[in-house]
């Protein structure tokens, strides 16, 4: 919505332009009228829409044509004033003033025009018979108001309609020649309907209609009013009401009716509540609400976010099989202007039979987006209507910004639930297979798969009895680590091929260059263990290297057969406890402490639960 409104009054000499302005401001007909009034600014607090309004007069005696063109260029709306008793001033509306205002402008970019018939006190009848042909000829004419500056009749209405033409314009919504909603408006209202009907049955129930009404207008509809609305739709459409609910066609018809009856502010209120601007595009303020993220912090979905996303999943899982089919996923993304997830999704998260997306994989993908690009995540939540459906100011309500990592290290504990692991190693080590194994795919299954590759894989692991999300990122040796800023992560997995004698050198070099002086926990993983281990050409063995640098001993891994998930838990645990020395992570006493901590937490929780039950 515009922040202010600039109204320009045009018309032939002596039609009463200046008198109208002075009558509005002084609330009386002026005894003496200057040839032109100074620009008037009406403050926001005295206008119905709470928007400051500037009213500009025009005088052909005082102003040149160049000055007139400048004023037209600055105006948001033009009031063409005519004398209801003078047919020549009416004729000049179409032959002179409207062509001067809009000239050769494109239909969608023309200035809105209000026709103002002044001096109605001097005429018994109405000028509308002469005006209607002009209104039919020029679609940019919003309305016509007959008034009297002398009797103060309809003066405030003139400027109200002018303001309304700017703040709630008809042109973006409705094509008066075709007598139907414009495509962009229909598209926006279809998205709004899809968001508002929350069980995906293509019908707005009474409950959903009331929630929609409350959200947009601040109060629910009375039961009789609901029935009256449906009755109007039913009488005028063949399929607007079904199973006592409003269909999409019924919803579109209602908005068309509002506009045709001059109540387009109703449709604009709906559109703006759902984030649309005057061009019917979602605003940046709606899609990208401000979120402060300190340098060492990360971003995660909180339980509000997961709860909302699970509900959205269940809405589109029509067959209730716990997984979204391609058509169900397409339905899910119907409120997006584009499909945000590509074919690599199948290699990023766990999928069900036939490539369907189960709830677990779906939540993992959202977790990945929230961690890597929170602003994109906020955008996606905005498309789904999070602020409206959750009755929140913005979708930042669904996001937790974690404590800075330096504070976690200082306090010796972290509250994070999502960790990033960089998987680093020379080409051909088996990094991609390691990522796919995290999703439960054996090497044989990977070789038979035609899924497109992904540099990420996301899954959950247990750390001390608690479920955490672990994101694996495969570092491209050709493009990554060009600078130190490429290295940060929660844990580094340095992977070498035990069957290649030159493989360990790369990992040792990366460790010394980027991680030896850092506080990032590191684990060395010897891959392809099933192919036999050879001596590494490094001077000292991988085990000796790890011992020398106080790291846990190398973990041997193979993708043959059923993947072993132990290493993934070790990586997540190292990320969750970065304050501990790396060698402590490999000791039995550490793992016992983690297990005992989880057990104690469970016992305390159960004891509190029983105490609460007794108190009830």
UniProtKB/Swiss-Prot annotation:
Stretches assigned to the Miro domain: 2-168, 416-577
Known catalytic reactions: GTP + H2O = GDP + phosphate + H(+); ATP + H2O = ADP + phosphate + H(+); UTP + H2O = UDP + phosphate + H(+)
Keywords tagged on the record: Calcium, GTP-binding, Hydrolase, Magnesium, Membrane, Metal-binding, Mitochondrion, Mitochondrion outer membrane, Nucleotide-binding, Repeat, Transmembrane, Transmembrane helix
Residues on Cytoplasmic side: 1-590
Binding site for GTP 1: 16-19, 59, 118-119, 121, 149-150
Record-level GO cellular component terms: mitochondrial outer membrane
TM helices/strands, residue ranges: 591-613
GO molecular function list: calcium ion binding; GTP binding; GTPase activity
Membrane-side (Mitochondrial intermembrane) residue stretches: 614-616
Residues the record lists as binding Mg(2+) 1: 18, 57
Disulfide bonds: none
Keyword hit for Membrane: yes
Cellular localization per UniProt: Mitochondrion outer membrane
Gene Ontology terms describing biological process: cellular homeostasis; mitochondrial outer membrane permeabilization; mitochondrion transport along microtubule
Binding-site residues, Ca(2+) 1: 199, 201, 208
EC number(s) recorded for this UniProt protein: 3.6.5.-
Residues bound to GTP 2: 428, 430-433, 528, 530, 559
Entries under NCBIfam families matching the protein: small_GTP
Subunit details: Homodimer.
Family the entry assigns: Belongs to the mitochondrial Rho GTPase family.
Protein name: Mitochondrial Rho GTPase 2
Organism name: Xenopus tropicalis
Underlying gene: rhot2
């Amino acid at each position: 919505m515009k922040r202010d409104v600039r109204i320009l009054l045009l018309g032939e000499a002596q039609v009463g332009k200046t008198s109208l302005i002075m009558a509005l401001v002084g609330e009386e007909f002026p005894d003496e009228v200057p040839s032109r009034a100074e620009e008037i600014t009406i403050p926001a607090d005295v206008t119905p829409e709470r928007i400051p309004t500037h009213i500009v007069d025009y005088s052909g005696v005082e102003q040149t044509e160049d000055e007139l063109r400048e004023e037209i260029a600055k105006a948001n709306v033009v009031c063409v004033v005519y004398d209801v008793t003078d047919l020549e001033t009416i004729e000049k509306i179409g032959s002179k003033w409207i062509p001067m205002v809009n000239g050769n402008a494109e239909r969608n970019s023309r200035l809105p025009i209000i026709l103002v018939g002044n001096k109605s006190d001097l005429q018994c009848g109405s000028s509308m018979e002469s005006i209607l042909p002009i209104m039919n000829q020029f679609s940019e004419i919003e309305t016509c108001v007959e008034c009297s500056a002398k009797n103060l009749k309809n003066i405030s209405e003139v400027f109200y309609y002018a303001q309304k033409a700017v703040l709630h314009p008809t042109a973006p919504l409705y094509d008066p020649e075709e007598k139907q909603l414009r495509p962009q408006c229909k598209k926006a209202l279809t998205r709004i309907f899809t968001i508002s009907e929350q069980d995906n049955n293509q019908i707005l129930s009474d409950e959903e209609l009331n929630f929609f009404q409350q959200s947009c207008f601040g109060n629910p509809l009375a039961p009789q009013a609901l029935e009256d609305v449906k009755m109007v739709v039913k009488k005028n459409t063949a399929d607007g009401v079904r199973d006592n609910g409003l269909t999409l066609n019924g919803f579109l018809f209602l908005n068309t009716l509002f506009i045709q009856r001059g109540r387009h502010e109703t449709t604009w209120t709906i559109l703006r509540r759902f984030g649309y601007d005057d061009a019917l595009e979602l605003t940046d303020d709606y899609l990208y609400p401000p979120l402060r993220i300190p340098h060492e912090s990360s971003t995660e979905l909180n339980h509000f976010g997961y709860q909302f996303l699970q509900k959205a999943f269940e809405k589109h899982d029509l067959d209730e099989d716990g997984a979204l089919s391609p058509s169900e996923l397409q339905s899910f993304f119907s409120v997006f202007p584009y499909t945000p997830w590509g074919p690599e999704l199948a290699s990023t998260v766990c999928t069900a039979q036939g490539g369907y997306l189960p709830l677990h994989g779906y939540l993992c993908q959202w977790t990945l987006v929230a961690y890597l690009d929170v602003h994109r995540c906020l955008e996606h939540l905005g498309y789904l209507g999070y602020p409206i459906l959750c009755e929140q100011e913005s979708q930042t309500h669904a996001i937790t910004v974690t404590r800075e990592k330096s504070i976690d290290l200082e306090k010796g504990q972290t509250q994070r639930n999502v960790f990033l692991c960089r998987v680093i190693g020379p080409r051909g080590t088996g990094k991609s297979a390691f990522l796919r194994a995290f999703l439960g795919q054996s090497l044989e299954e990977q070789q038979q798969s035609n899924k497109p590759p992904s540099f990420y894989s996301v899954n959950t692991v247990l750390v001390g009895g608690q479920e955490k999300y672990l994101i694996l990122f495969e570092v491209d040796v050709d493009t990554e680590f060009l600078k130190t800023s490429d290295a940060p992560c929660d844990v580094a997995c340095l992977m070498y091929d035990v069957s290649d004698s030159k493989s360990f050198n790369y990992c040792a070099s990366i460790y010394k260059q980027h991680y030896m002086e850092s506080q990032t926990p590191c684990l060395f993983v010897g891959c392809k263990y099933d192919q036999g281990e050879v001596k590494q050409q490094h001077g000292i063995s991988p085990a000796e290297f790890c011992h020398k640098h106080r790291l846990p001993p190398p973990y041997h891994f193979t993708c043959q057969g059923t993947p072993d998930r132990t290493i993934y838990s070790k990586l997540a645990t190292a990320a969750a406890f970065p304050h501990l020395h790396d060698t402590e992570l490999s000791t039995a006493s550490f793992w016992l402490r983690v297990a005992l901590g989880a057990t104690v937490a469970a016992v305390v929780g159960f004891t509190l639960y029983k105490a609460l039950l007794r108190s009830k």
